[in-house]
UniProtKB/Swiss-Prot annotation:
Top-level enzyme category: transferase
GO CC terms of this entry: cytosol
Top-level taxonomic group: Bacteria
Protein name: Methylenetetrahydrofolate--tRNA-(uracil-5-)-methyltransferase TrmFO
Residue sites binding FAD per the record: 12-17
Database matches in InterPro entries: FAD/NAD-bd_sf, MnmG-rel, MnmG-rel_CS, MnmG_N, TrmFO
Tagged with keyword NADP: yes
Function per UniProt: Catalyzes the folate-dependent formation of 5-methyl-uridine at position 54 (M-5-U54) in all tRNAs.
Subcellular location(s) of the protein: Cytoplasm
Required cofactor names: FAD
Length: 460
């Protein structure tokens, strides 16, 4: 098979690329899957198998009442090869879908190699193919040569090589009796939620930050992190001095709770906060809030413990923890449509961690949609996007519509789904309703698509 006879090329043999190539081939379209290993290795991989799980062997919670579990179920219903293989090789892991990673990756490699329409090509791709239908699924450790070409294609401002992200919190879990909505000096629209701290609260918070247990950067991440002096972990700022945070991300000047009066009134001077943690709106609906300046290397359990000491966040529900690690990803809101096509070149698609989704299952979901749409383009059909009420649809709607200025990778979570018609306070019941709506709407979507393409096997 050559590039001219193959209708689609997939670059990258991780979870996203494996899923994408399978969906293209299952639609009857010849595909070349490029994987650079073992010709060129990465610091994180240990084998030449496709879909190697380089970190945990877990795909997250199995229950469809959980965000990851709902995404599993959606992919299961869409005939995902990744989830089918994970189900087949699952190992006991409590409530999580975990796999025997060696057997899992080996079977996927054999399955794709044996497909008559898939050619697995072991070579490093150093250029983005200039024509034809192409899916980029090169992952967080994209080779330096291809990363440079991708950076040239997208523009310098639209590539990130180190993921320094603050935690993201569900808005409903923030105590609005304490947190107040305001912008500094009342300039412009009140765009931030602000959590005020008095001196005692601030010093306790700083002490806990300084002694909290940190996660170690991997060896290959340390060099990249050296260039990030301008984006230091919050615990590093805390250790540099008692007031360092108060003159940095926790700066209180110009922030005052209007419920307490006019901050310009000298009589209210004693009411002004000693320090302020600011939360910035993360999505259009205002359901998710980002802790401004709180990129961190703390272990996840420590983040929850320490950050819940902040007044107003005592019951905070985290949908994403703060991270600092090597992660090549593009600015998807600037570059991609919800179909995962590049706006500037609709025959070029992308999937996986490269587009700013987080986690194994989300990478597989991106591979499914990119592969499905690449096949549809090859067949002369319109690309699809899934309903925003599904976890898949909501995730790709988010990464293609979030603020480009503040875009950071996002895992699947219920906070990105549209509100239910009726507010439900019980979390378990609310998540169950999200699940029921998502699966019903996914079923309707499949039915409608199949009615319009009787001869296609993309969706069954």
């Amino acid at each position: 098979m050559t590039e001219s006879t193959a209708k689609v090329q997939v670059i990258g043999g991780g979870l996203a690329g494996t899923e994408a190539a399978w969906q293209v081939a299952q639609a009857g379209i010849p595909v070349i899957l490029h994987e650079m290993r073992p010709i060129r290795t990465s610091p994180a991989h240990h084998s030449q198998e496709l879909a190697e799980l380089v970190c945990s062997n877990s795909f997250g919670a199995m229950s469809s009442n959980r965000a990851a579990g709902l995404l599993h179920e959606e992919l299961r219903r869409l005939n995902s090869i990744i989830i089918q293989t994970a189900d087949k090789h699952a190992v006991p892991a409590g409530g999580a879908l975990a796999v025997d990673r060696g057997v899992f990756s080996h079977q996927l490699t054999q399955t794709l190699q044996n497909h008559p329409l898939i050619e697995l090509r072991r070579s490093e791709v150093q250029e983005i193919p200039s024509d034809g239908i192409v899916i980029l699924a090169t992952g967080p450790l994209t080779s330096p040569v291809l990363a440079e070409k991708l950076q040239q294609f997208t523009g310098m401002a639209y590539m990130s090589f180190f993921d320094a992200a603050s935690p993201i919190i569900v808005g409903d879990s923030i105590n609005r009796d304490i947190a107040f909505l305001a912008s500094r000096y009342d300039k412009g629209e009140a765009a931030y939620l602000n959590c005020p701290l008095n001196p005692e609260q601030y010093l306790q918070f700083r002490d806990e930050l300084c002694t909290a247990e940190q996660a170690e950067l991997k060896e290959f991440e340390r060099e990249t992190a050296k260039f990030f002096e301008g984006c230091l972990p919050i615990e590093e700022l805390a250790q540099r001095g008692e007031d360092t945070m108060r003159y940095g991300p926790l700066k209180p000047v110009g922030l005052f709770d209007a419920r307490l009066g006019d901050f310009r009134d000298p009589e209210n001077k004693e009411k002004r906060p000693y320090a302020v943690v600011q939360l910035r709106q993360e999505d259009k609906q205002g359901k998710l809030w980002n802790m401004v300046g709180f990129q961190t290397n703390l272990k996840w359990g420590e983040q929850k413990r320490v950050f819940r000491l902040i007044p107003g966040l005592e019951n905070a529900e985290f949908v994403r923890m703060g991270v600092m690690h090597r992660n090549t990803f593009i600015n998807s809101p600037q570059l991609l449509d919800p179909t995962l096509q590049f706006k500037s070149r609709p025959t070029l698609l992308a999937a996986g961690q490269l587009i700013g989704t987080e986690g194994y299952t989300a990478a597989s979901a991106g591979g499914w949609l990119a592969g499905t749409n690449a096949a549809r383009i090859a067949l002369g059909l319109e690309p699809i996007s899934l309903p925003s009420t599904t976890m898949m649809g909501a995730l790709f709607e988010f990464i293609s519509s979030a603020s480009p200025k503040h875009f950071q990778p996002m895992p699947p979570n219920f906070g990105i789904l549209p509100d239910l018609p009726v507010r439900i306070r019980n979390k378990r019941e609310r998540y169950g309703k999200y699940r029921d709506r998502a699966l019903a709407d996914l079923n309707d979507c499949q039915t409608q698509l199949n009615n319009h393409q009787k001869n296609s096997v993309i969706l069954v």
